[in-house]
A protein has these predicted regions:
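Conserved glycine-rich cofactor-binding loop
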Residues: 20-21
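Conserved mid-core segment of classical short-chain dehydrogenase/reductases
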Residues: 74, 97-107
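A conserved hydrophobic alpha-helix of the Rossmann-fold in NAD(P)-dependent oxidoreductases
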Residues: 48, 73-80
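Conserved glycine-rich Rossmann-like NAD(P)H-binding loop of the short-chain dehydrogenase/reductase
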Residues: 34-51
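Rossmann-fold cofactor-recognition segment
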Residues: 55-71
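N-terminal Rossmann-fold NAD(P) dinucleotide-binding loop
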Residues: 24-25
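Rossmann-fold scaffold of SDR-type NAD(P)-dependent oxidoreductases
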Residues: 17, 87-95
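Flexible N-terminal pre-Rossmann segment of NAD(P)-dependent oxidoreductases
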Residues: 1-15
Length: 107
């Protein structure tokens, strides 16, 4: 049976990469408040610590990393595996908005 409502993510193990601001932060907070275990990653560790405090600190992992560094991503994954045994959902929302016209960049 499909879960719905507030308990849809309860107990799920979620890794949010890009969790320190914007969409990533909003998703991370919502997931924490819905009872998910959330691993928070970005380069800004102090910001991740603040976000982790929006819920039970035992349901969050703070894993500072730079997404351009493959070794850091692998170590982050290993940290989650050791703590929780796996990941149910990955949200990769790292990045930033750069206002450019469509004809000014390559796709």
């Amino acid at each position: 049976m499909k879960q719905s409502g507030i308990d849809q993510f309860s107990g799920k193990r979620v890794w949010v990469i890009g969790a320190s601001s914007g969409i990533g932060e909003a998703c991370a907070k919502a997931l924490i408040l819905q009872g998910a275990k959330v691993a928070l990653s970005s380069r800004r560790a102090e910001r991740l610590d603040q976000i982790a405090l929006c819920g039970d600190v035992n349901q969050s992992l703070v894993i500072p990393l730079d997404v351009t560094n493959d070794e850091q991503l692998q170590e982050g994954y290993k940290t989650i595996l050791k703590a929780w045994g796996g990941i149910d959902l990955l949200l990769f929302v790292s990045g930033m908005y750069v206002p450019l016209r469509a004809d000014n960049f390559d796709i």
